[in-house]
């Protein structure tokens, strides 16, 4: 029906498994977009009324109030069967399909859908960057050459996870393994171990590389920041209030990875994507100067003033090429500049700019 109405791409619901997506691909000649990373809904896509009743906003209209991330008491025959350590009975783990990306692509998925509309720039940029890397790897090397680096999984966990990841319904595995019962939000990654606590002078052992500026969680209300880089396996000392429950042997999680945040800031935030273009400048005496810009098979030409004879300093091809390549902070980079120039003509620098 959607194809008959003119749809060229359909987005599958998150509860579909890969076999169902493959069957859909074989039956319909339309592009398929499927979810691969981010939050999962507890309810069926488009059929949840819990948010409307419990939060006053419709999840079916993109305004979910997140009732599945709230704590609940669970009863069986009148007896409470959960406690505060597993009170988030409706909160699924986040999905990560990176390890099974070849299966996803081979099932017929044309476009990967990544959560990001309500996420910060670090999340959106880094998750997309990592998935782009492995899509390219699969396309270049095939299934045999596809291998996910553990560091990339660690980076995804550092950015956001709700107690490890799940592949969701893609492999038809359902139940408790998909759930994050103890906590509904970012759980960080286990990074430090308390070696000793001497009246607030805490010695930590780094289980992973620690970066200056990393943020570590003590409890829901308290955290501290690393003041230096520390290699995995090394120890370091931090002075903290005695009241904090940092007993010997406790594992402390990193909630914010400063290195990842800096990478995104340096490579994505405020960076203008560059387009490589070719230019052809035609300078003929007694004719309008013209510039043609070429990009990906598209050509656009603009014309300027009439070119006149130089009285003192004629234009040179070298100088014109140099000025053409001065694109400043625009999105263009001049890869090749061709100049067709008559001898002895005058070209003001302002014309080229």
Summary of predicted features, one role per range:
Residues 3-353:
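Surface-exposed amphipathic alpha-helical tracts and adjacent flexible/coil segments at the periphery
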């Amino acid at each position: 029906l959607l194809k008959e109405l003119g749809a060229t791409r359909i987005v599958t619901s998150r509860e579909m498994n890969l076999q169902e997506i493959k069957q859909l691909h074989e039956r319909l000649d339309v592009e398929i977009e499927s979810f691969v990373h981010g939050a999962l809904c507890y309810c069926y896509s488009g059929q949840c009324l819990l948010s409307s009743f419990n939060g006053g906003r419709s999840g079916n209209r993109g305004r979910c109030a997140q009732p599945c991330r709230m704590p609940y008491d669970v009863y069986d025959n009148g007896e409470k069967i959960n406690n505060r350590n597993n009170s988030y009975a409706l909160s699924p783990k986040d999905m990560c399909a990176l390890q099974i990306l070849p299966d996803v692509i081979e099932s017929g998925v044309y476009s990967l859908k990544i959560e990001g509309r309500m996420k910060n720039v670090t999340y959106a940029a880094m998750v997309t960057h990592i998935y782009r890397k492995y899509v390219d790897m699969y396309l270049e090397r095939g299934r045999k050459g596809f291998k996910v680096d553990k560091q990339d999984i660690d980076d995804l966990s550092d950015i956001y996870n709700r107690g490890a990841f799940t592949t969701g319904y893609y492999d038809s595995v359902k139940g408790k393994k998909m759930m994050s019962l103890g906590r509904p939000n970012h759980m960080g990654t286990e990074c430090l171990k308390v070696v000793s606590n001497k009246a607030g002078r805490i010695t930590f052992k780094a289980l992973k590389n620690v970066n200056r500026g990393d943020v570590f969680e003590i409890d829901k209300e308290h955290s501290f920041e690393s003041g230096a880089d520390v290699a995995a396996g090394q120890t370091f000392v931090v002075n903290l209030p005695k009241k904090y429950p940092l007993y010997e042997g406790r594992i402390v999680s990193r909630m914010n990875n400063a290195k990842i945040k800096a990478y995104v800031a340096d490579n994505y935030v405020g960076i203008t994507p560059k387009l490589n273009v070719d230019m052809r400048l035609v300078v003929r005496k007694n004719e309008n100067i013209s510039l043609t810009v070429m990009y990906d098979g598209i050509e656009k030409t603009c014309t300027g003033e009439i070119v006149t004879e130089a009285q003192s300093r004629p234009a040179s091809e070298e100088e014109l090429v140099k000025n053409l390549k001065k694109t400043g902070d625009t999105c263009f980079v001049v890869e090749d500049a061709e100049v067709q120039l008559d001898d002895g003509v005058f070209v003001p620098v302002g014309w080229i700019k």
